[in-house]
Protein backbone atom coordinates (compact mmCIF):
# COMPACT_ATOMS: atom_id res chain seq x y z
CA UNK A 1 0.00 0.00 0.00
CA UNK A 2 2.72 2.49 0.95
CA UNK A 3 4.39 2.07 -2.44
CA UNK A 4 1.24 3.49 -4.05
CA UNK A 5 0.90 6.48 -1.73
CA UNK A 6 1.00 9.71 -3.76
CA UNK A 7 0.26 12.16 -0.96
CA UNK A 8 -1.20 12.46 2.53
CA UNK A 9 -2.70 15.17 4.70
CA UNK A 10 -1.35 14.83 8.22
CA UNK A 11 -1.73 16.67 11.53
CA UNK A 12 1.67 16.77 13.19
CA UNK A 13 2.46 17.15 16.89
CA UNK A 14 2.37 20.96 16.72
CA UNK A 15 -1.26 20.84 15.58
CA UNK A 16 -0.48 21.91 12.03
CA UNK A 17 -2.18 20.27 9.04
CA UNK A 18 0.49 19.50 6.48
CA UNK A 19 0.56 18.05 2.99
CA UNK A 20 3.15 15.34 2.40
CA UNK A 21 4.07 14.53 -1.18
CA UNK A 22 6.99 14.59 -3.59
CA UNK A 23 6.58 18.36 -3.87
CA UNK A 24 5.49 19.29 -0.33
CA UNK A 25 7.35 18.17 2.79
CA UNK A 26 9.10 15.40 0.84
CA UNK A 27 10.98 14.21 3.93
CA UNK A 28 7.68 13.56 5.70
CA UNK A 29 6.28 11.89 2.59
CA UNK A 30 9.28 9.55 2.49
CA UNK A 31 8.91 8.67 6.18
CA UNK A 32 5.18 7.95 5.99
CA UNK A 33 5.86 5.17 3.49
CA UNK A 34 7.14 2.63 6.01
CA UNK A 35 7.51 4.56 9.26
CA UNK A 36 4.08 3.77 10.66
CA UNK A 37 2.18 6.21 12.88
CA UNK A 38 5.24 7.97 14.25
CA UNK A 39 4.74 11.35 12.64
CA UNK A 40 1.15 12.42 13.19
CA UNK A 41 -2.49 11.68 12.46
CA UNK A 42 -3.21 11.21 8.77
CA UNK A 43 -6.59 12.63 7.75
CA UNK A 44 -6.53 11.66 4.07
CA UNK A 45 -4.53 9.58 1.60
CA UNK A 46 -4.06 9.94 -2.16
CA UNK A 47 -3.24 6.61 -3.80
CA UNK A 48 -2.00 5.62 -7.24
CA UNK A 49 -4.60 3.40 -8.90
CA UNK A 50 -3.86 0.70 -11.46
CA UNK A 51 -6.26 -0.26 -14.25
CA UNK A 52 -7.53 -3.83 -14.16
CA UNK A 53 -10.60 -5.86 -15.03
CA UNK A 54 -13.09 -6.23 -12.19
CA UNK A 55 -13.35 -9.95 -12.91
CA UNK A 56 -10.37 -12.03 -11.80
CA UNK A 57 -9.74 -15.74 -11.29
CA UNK A 58 -9.62 -16.46 -7.59
CA UNK A 59 -10.69 -18.42 -4.55
CA UNK A 60 -9.41 -21.17 -2.30
CA UNK A 61 -8.02 -24.58 -3.15
CA UNK A 62 -7.84 -27.13 -0.31
CA UNK A 63 -5.39 -30.02 0.14
CA UNK A 64 -5.15 -32.99 2.53
CA UNK A 65 -3.58 -31.81 5.76
CA UNK A 66 -1.51 -34.98 5.81
CA UNK A 67 0.32 -33.56 2.78
CA UNK A 68 1.13 -30.28 4.54
CA UNK A 69 4.92 -30.48 4.30
CA UNK A 70 4.74 -31.43 0.63
CA UNK A 71 2.26 -28.65 -0.13
CA UNK A 72 4.27 -25.93 1.63
CA UNK A 73 7.49 -27.04 -0.05
CA UNK A 74 5.76 -26.94 -3.44
CA UNK A 75 4.32 -23.52 -2.63
CA UNK A 76 7.77 -22.15 -1.77
CA UNK A 77 9.15 -23.31 -5.11
CA UNK A 78 6.09 -22.25 -7.11
CA UNK A 79 6.27 -18.70 -5.74
CA UNK A 80 9.78 -18.21 -7.08
CA UNK A 81 8.68 -18.19 -10.72
CA UNK A 82 5.04 -17.10 -10.66
CA UNK A 83 3.99 -14.05 -12.71
CA UNK A 84 3.39 -10.71 -11.00
CA UNK A 85 -0.33 -10.87 -11.78
CA UNK A 86 -0.73 -13.96 -9.58
CA UNK A 87 -0.97 -13.68 -5.80
CA UNK A 88 -1.14 -16.76 -3.56
CA UNK A 89 -1.29 -17.02 0.24
CA UNK A 90 -0.95 -20.30 2.13
CA UNK A 91 -3.02 -20.98 5.25
CA UNK A 92 -2.75 -23.77 7.84
CA UNK A 93 -5.46 -23.89 10.49
CA UNK A 94 -6.11 -26.33 13.32
CA UNK A 95 -9.65 -25.49 14.51
CA UNK A 96 -10.96 -26.05 18.04
CA UNK A 97 -13.37 -28.74 19.23
CA UNK A 98 -11.42 -31.56 17.59
CA UNK A 99 -12.37 -30.55 14.05
CA UNK A 100 -10.09 -31.57 11.20
CA UNK A 101 -7.17 -29.29 10.37
CA UNK A 102 -7.32 -27.34 7.11
CA UNK A 103 -4.66 -26.51 4.54
CA UNK A 104 -5.39 -24.28 1.58
CA UNK A 105 -4.07 -21.72 -0.88
CA UNK A 106 -5.88 -18.42 -1.34
CA UNK A 107 -5.49 -17.39 -4.99
CA UNK A 108 -6.01 -14.22 -7.04
CA UNK A 109 -5.00 -14.16 -10.72
CA UNK A 110 -5.52 -10.84 -12.49
CA UNK A 111 -3.81 -11.67 -15.78
CA UNK A 112 -5.43 -12.51 -19.09
CA UNK A 113 -8.22 -15.08 -18.57
CA UNK A 114 -6.97 -17.25 -21.44
CA UNK A 115 -3.71 -17.82 -19.53
CA UNK A 116 -5.35 -18.70 -16.20
CA UNK A 117 -5.67 -22.45 -16.78
CA UNK A 118 -1.99 -22.76 -17.74
CA UNK A 119 -0.74 -20.60 -14.86
CA UNK A 120 -2.87 -22.35 -12.23
CA UNK A 121 -2.52 -25.89 -13.57
CA UNK A 122 0.42 -26.76 -11.26
CA UNK A 123 -1.77 -26.05 -8.22
CA UNK A 124 -4.17 -28.74 -9.38
CA UNK A 125 -1.58 -31.29 -10.45
CA UNK A 126 1.14 -31.70 -7.81
CA UNK A 127 -1.32 -33.02 -5.19
CA UNK A 128 -4.95 -33.89 -5.79
CA UNK A 129 -7.02 -31.13 -4.14
CA UNK A 130 -9.78 -31.96 -1.68
CA UNK A 131 -11.80 -28.98 -2.91
CA UNK A 132 -11.18 -26.46 -5.68
CA UNK A 133 -13.10 -23.17 -5.37
CA UNK A 134 -10.98 -21.17 -7.84
CA UNK A 135 -13.33 -19.51 -10.32
CA UNK A 136 -14.07 -16.25 -12.14
CA UNK A 137 -15.06 -13.78 -9.44
CA UNK A 138 -15.56 -10.06 -8.94
CA UNK A 139 -12.37 -8.56 -7.51
CA UNK A 140 -14.18 -6.57 -4.82
CA UNK A 141 -16.16 -9.65 -3.78
CA UNK A 142 -12.89 -11.58 -3.50
CA UNK A 143 -11.39 -8.85 -1.34
CA UNK A 144 -14.43 -9.00 0.97
CA UNK A 145 -14.58 -12.79 1.15
CA UNK A 146 -12.73 -12.96 4.49
CA UNK A 147 -14.58 -10.11 6.18
CA UNK A 148 -16.38 -12.50 8.53
CA UNK A 149 -13.32 -14.58 9.42
CA UNK A 150 -12.60 -12.48 12.54
CA UNK A 151 -16.02 -12.14 14.17
CA UNK A 152 -16.69 -10.05 17.25
CA UNK A 153 -16.42 -11.98 20.46
CA UNK A 154 -13.21 -13.73 19.44
CA UNK A 155 -9.85 -13.27 21.09
CA UNK A 156 -6.62 -13.67 19.17
CA UNK A 157 -2.89 -13.43 19.70
CA UNK A 158 -0.71 -13.13 16.60
CA UNK A 159 3.01 -12.88 15.88
CA UNK A 160 4.63 -12.31 12.51
CA UNK A 161 7.92 -11.84 10.72
CA UNK A 162 9.43 -11.72 7.25
CA UNK A 163 11.08 -14.70 5.61
CA UNK A 164 13.41 -14.65 2.63
CA UNK A 165 13.32 -18.40 2.08
CA UNK A 166 10.78 -21.05 3.11
CA UNK A 167 13.31 -23.70 4.09
CA UNK A 168 12.68 -27.37 4.86
CA UNK A 169 13.62 -26.70 8.48
CA UNK A 170 11.01 -23.95 8.71
CA UNK A 171 8.36 -26.19 7.16
CA UNK A 172 9.16 -28.99 9.60
CA UNK A 173 9.05 -26.63 12.57
CA UNK A 174 5.71 -25.12 11.55
CA UNK A 175 3.93 -28.42 11.03
CA UNK A 176 5.43 -30.39 13.91
CA UNK A 177 4.55 -27.68 16.45
CA UNK A 178 1.10 -26.59 15.25
CA UNK A 179 -1.09 -27.83 18.08
CA UNK A 180 -4.73 -28.89 18.03
CA UNK A 181 -6.70 -27.81 21.09
CA UNK A 182 -10.33 -28.25 22.10
CA UNK A 183 -10.68 -24.60 23.17
CA UNK A 184 -8.71 -22.64 20.57
CA UNK A 185 -7.84 -22.49 16.93
CA UNK A 186 -4.17 -22.49 15.98
CA UNK A 187 -2.85 -21.13 12.71
CA UNK A 188 0.07 -20.24 10.50
CA UNK A 189 -0.10 -18.45 7.17
CA UNK A 190 2.22 -17.03 4.54
CA UNK A 191 1.43 -13.76 2.74
CA UNK A 192 3.28 -13.45 -0.53
CA UNK A 193 5.71 -10.60 -1.17
CA UNK A 194 8.32 -10.31 -3.94
CA UNK A 195 7.20 -9.14 -7.37
CA UNK A 196 6.82 -5.37 -7.72
CA UNK A 197 7.89 -4.87 -4.09
CA UNK A 198 11.44 -5.77 -5.10
CA UNK A 199 11.50 -3.34 -8.01
CA UNK A 200 11.65 -0.26 -5.77
CA UNK A 201 15.01 0.88 -4.42
CA UNK A 202 15.50 0.35 -0.70
CA UNK A 203 16.27 4.05 -0.20
CA UNK A 204 13.15 5.24 -2.07
CA UNK A 205 10.86 4.77 0.95
CA UNK A 206 11.17 4.06 4.66
CA UNK A 207 10.33 0.37 4.10
CA UNK A 208 13.70 -1.42 3.86
CA UNK A 209 12.69 -5.09 3.57
CA UNK A 210 12.60 -5.36 -0.22
CA UNK A 211 14.20 -8.80 -0.54
CA UNK A 212 11.66 -10.82 1.45
CA UNK A 213 9.61 -13.58 -0.13
CA UNK A 214 6.77 -13.77 2.44
CA UNK A 215 5.31 -12.45 5.65
CA UNK A 216 4.74 -15.34 8.07
CA UNK A 217 2.06 -14.99 10.73
CA UNK A 218 1.26 -17.50 13.46
CA UNK A 219 -1.30 -17.28 16.22
CA UNK A 220 -4.17 -18.54 18.30
CA UNK A 221 -7.89 -17.63 18.37
CA UNK A 222 -10.43 -18.44 21.08
CA UNK A 223 -13.99 -17.51 22.11
CA UNK A 224 -14.42 -14.53 24.41
CA UNK A 225 -14.99 -15.38 28.04
CA UNK A 226 -12.05 -17.76 28.21
CA UNK A 227 -8.87 -16.93 30.08
CA UNK A 228 -6.61 -15.58 27.30
CA UNK A 229 -3.34 -16.31 29.08
CA UNK A 230 -2.85 -20.00 28.19
CA UNK A 231 -3.76 -19.39 24.55
CA UNK A 232 -1.51 -16.35 24.20
CA UNK A 233 1.27 -18.27 25.96
CA UNK A 234 0.92 -21.12 23.47
CA UNK A 235 1.14 -18.67 20.55
CA UNK A 236 4.26 -17.08 22.05
CA UNK A 237 5.79 -20.52 22.52
CA UNK A 238 5.00 -21.46 18.92
CA UNK A 239 6.48 -18.19 17.72
CA UNK A 240 9.66 -18.74 19.71
CA UNK A 241 10.18 -21.94 17.74
CA UNK A 242 9.82 -20.30 14.32
CA UNK A 243 11.09 -16.73 14.79
CA UNK A 244 14.68 -17.79 14.17
CA UNK A 245 13.69 -18.35 10.54
CA UNK A 246 12.44 -14.77 10.19
CA UNK A 247 14.30 -11.58 9.38
CA UNK A 248 12.51 -8.39 10.39
CA UNK A 249 8.79 -7.73 10.65
CA UNK A 250 5.98 -5.62 9.24
CA UNK A 251 5.72 -2.47 11.33
CA UNK A 252 1.92 -2.51 11.50
CA UNK A 253 2.00 -6.07 12.88
CA UNK A 254 4.39 -5.31 15.73
CA UNK A 255 2.94 -6.16 19.13
CA UNK A 256 4.90 -6.62 22.31
CA UNK A 257 8.19 -6.22 20.45
CA UNK A 258 11.30 -5.15 22.32
CA UNK A 259 12.12 -1.46 21.61
CA UNK A 260 15.64 -2.40 20.50
CA UNK A 261 14.20 -4.80 17.93
CA UNK A 262 11.90 -2.06 16.69
CA UNK A 263 14.86 0.24 16.07
CA UNK A 264 16.97 -2.38 14.32
CA UNK A 265 14.01 -3.43 12.16
CA UNK A 266 14.26 -0.14 10.25
CA UNK A 267 17.75 -1.15 9.09
CA UNK A 268 19.44 1.45 6.86
CA UNK A 269 16.47 3.82 7.00
CA UNK A 270 16.67 4.39 10.77
CA UNK A 271 18.96 7.44 10.85
CA UNK A 272 16.86 9.27 8.28
CA UNK A 273 13.66 8.32 10.11
CA UNK A 274 15.09 9.68 13.36
CA UNK A 275 15.84 12.97 11.60
CA UNK A 276 12.24 13.24 10.37
CA UNK A 277 10.86 12.22 13.77
CA UNK A 278 13.01 14.82 15.52
CA UNK A 279 11.77 17.51 13.13
CA UNK A 280 8.02 16.78 13.25
CA UNK A 281 7.57 15.13 16.68
CA UNK A 282 10.52 16.14 18.88
CA UNK A 283 8.68 15.30 22.13
CA UNK A 284 7.60 11.86 20.88
CA UNK A 285 3.88 12.54 21.27
CA UNK A 286 3.11 9.74 18.81
CA UNK A 287 4.76 6.84 20.61
CA UNK A 288 2.13 4.08 20.96
CA UNK A 289 3.47 2.35 17.86
CA UNK A 290 6.66 0.78 16.53
CA UNK A 291 8.32 3.79 18.00
CA UNK A 292 11.10 5.77 16.41
CA UNK A 293 12.71 7.78 19.18
CA UNK A 294 13.60 11.39 18.37
CA UNK A 295 17.02 12.73 19.13
CA UNK A 296 17.41 14.27 22.62
CA UNK A 297 16.34 17.89 22.67
CA UNK A 298 18.96 20.48 23.52
Task: Please tell me what each predicted stretch does.
Residues 1-298:
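Soluble FAD-dependent oxygen oxidases
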Amino acid sequence: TSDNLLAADIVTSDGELRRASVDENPDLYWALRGGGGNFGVVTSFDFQLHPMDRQVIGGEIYYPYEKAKEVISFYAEYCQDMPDDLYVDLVIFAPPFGLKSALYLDVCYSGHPKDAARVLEPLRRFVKPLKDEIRPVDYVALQKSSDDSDPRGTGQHLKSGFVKTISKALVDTLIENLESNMLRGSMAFFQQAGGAIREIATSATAFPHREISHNLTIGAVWPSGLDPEPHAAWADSYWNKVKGFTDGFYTNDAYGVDPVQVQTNYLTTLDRLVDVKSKYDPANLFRINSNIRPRPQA
